Amino acid sequence: AEDLEVGPGGVHVRGAPGRQVALADLVDGAGTVDGETRFQSNGAYTSAVHVVVLEVDPETATVHVLRYAIAHDCGQAINPLVVDGQLQGGLVHGLGYALMEEAVYQPDGTFATSNFADYTLPSRGIPMEVQPRLVEVHAPVLGNNPQGFKGVGETGTIAAPAAVVGALENALRRLGVHAEIGTLPVTPRRLYELLHA
């Protein structure tokens, strides 16, 4: 395979362009796709742990995320910098879901938060320390994925709201408020209501 090159006329032996097979001939030799063919697709399951340190200001009903740590099982990381960026970007989205992003509808069904003035997004760097750590755990059997690659795009986003809510409930308990948060986002208004229930 190392001696083969793909060129405009097909595939030829490196250094011997006369020894060539047209791409059409290669495709014809591969057979047809019949819709009945099946293959075993083994899952490449990923997991992550999120830990957040935050503080609640009971006077202003605001949350300040101070530190955030992520340990993510990414299998074999092809490009660790890209994985790190996916985790941090996903984290920002998850913090938005947890603390500010809310779809609000009017009683007549009209979407009330249809622009960036009304629908709050994390728009600047969130002032906190983020510590992502990649854990490369290779699954023993991955079938059609022998390199052990796993997904990374969603775990930054999905786990963040749960981690934030757990930390918020813990912070509220320290303030003498025993609340179970069941609605996101935990906006300052909702946090105020929890603090003064």
Show the residue positions of the predicted features:
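C-terminal catalytic domains of large/alpha subunits in multi-subunit enzymes
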Residues: 1-197
